Amino acid sequence: MKICDTVNSKLYKNDRAILHSDCNCFYASVECLLNPNIRDLPVAVSGDAENRHGIILAKNEEAKKYNIKTGEAIWQAKKKCPQLLTVPARLDVYKKFSDKVRRIYSNYTDMVEPFGLDEAWLDISEDYKNDALTIAKEISQRIKDEIGITVSIGVSFNKIFAKFGSDYKKPDAITCITRDNYKTLVWNSPAGDLLYVGGATRKKLEQIGIYTIGDIANAPIGLLRTHLGKWGDLIYGFANGYDSSPVARIGEYSEVKSIGNSTTAVRDLKNLDDIKVIAYVLCDSVCRRMREQGFMGKTVCVSMRDTGLSTITRQHTLNTYTSLTSDITKAAMALFKENFDNKSPLRSIGVSVTDFAHNNIPRQMDIFSDERKIIAEEKLDKTLDKLKQRFGNYIIRPASLLTDRGLSAFNPKDEHTIHPVGYL
């Protein structure tokens, strides 16, 4: 176990003691634990290669030596490492191991907030504030001894810096980020190392001369707002250590904030016609789940990942709340049409809806609304939902999906994949 910066590991009197624990190469580590014969080989866990969902979901330390990247296609990974051993993902198995790890966390606090299957925040302020580093060491050793995998743990006074700490040194390491050392450890790191600064945000920051987390922390807040909107305020606060978000308690009710689906296509999507086929299936799935849970949404988000693994996300807020498949599909396609450049084929796309209201609120109408048409569409959607629930997803489909049965032959509602956080 490697421990980074024990000299500056003391938290201040009024600080919280937050841990972020990350199971190293989780999916791959579990597979190697269950099959010791492959432990010393380059191993990657992947999706279904036959349906071109054969992307790398996780890899072990040996595979990392060949620069294997999460999210790339199996064939690309094997080009770098011909001897790469790929094993299919077994989410039910990983869920059981995740539960075992969380049971150890719960021995120390009831404030355990999962972040995917492989990561979690712990708030140990109440009982172990003055012994945060000691507790981190103990948790790390117990997981290694009792379960057989390793974790990297960040110790800090807020969730953002604790997460940074767990990423700072891997595998099997503990890093303390305190008020005395964060300007050295955090500020000198690339902007993209800050939680929630994705590829698109990083590129926008680079365009205005911001390359490190320290650059974000010391940038004029007005500059960040101009180029990033409210997101600029958020990451400015994160970079300066202002995060005060609480760690949720075990079993604490968490209100649904978004409903979405994404998929890797069986072939590259080269035009809007290709995108439309998959987008409809995704939108239909999202809207069915919204209706099942009694929600209507107002903000539609789309994501696009090209063959170079570059991802962009865009969103649009509607004038009224809706759960109609036609409304969400229309908004999603407008975003795809506006942002797809026809030059870079897409490997995967996603659709999600946020900004919810319960479907029992009065319908908001405007002068352009056709209430009779809306009521008719609501009845149609509900009827189709019942048919699909009883007879399966393929019992009835729009004729437009028949133009390419290969692209549309998936059911995201039933085949939703849980990816490790690193994939996102």
Predicted regions and their residues:
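Gly/Gly-Pro- and Ser/Thr-rich, intrinsically disordered tail segments characteristic of DNA damage-repair
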Residues: 1-237, 250, 288, 374-424
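Short, hydrophobic beta-strand segments
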Residues: 120-126, 313-316, 363-369
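Short, charged/polar surface micro-motifs in flexible loops or helix N-caps
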Residues: 26, 49-52, 307-310, 356-359
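C-terminal hydrophobic structural anchor segments
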Residues: 327, 333-390
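DNA-contacting surface of Y-family translesion DNA polymerases
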Residues: 11, 20, 203-346, 419
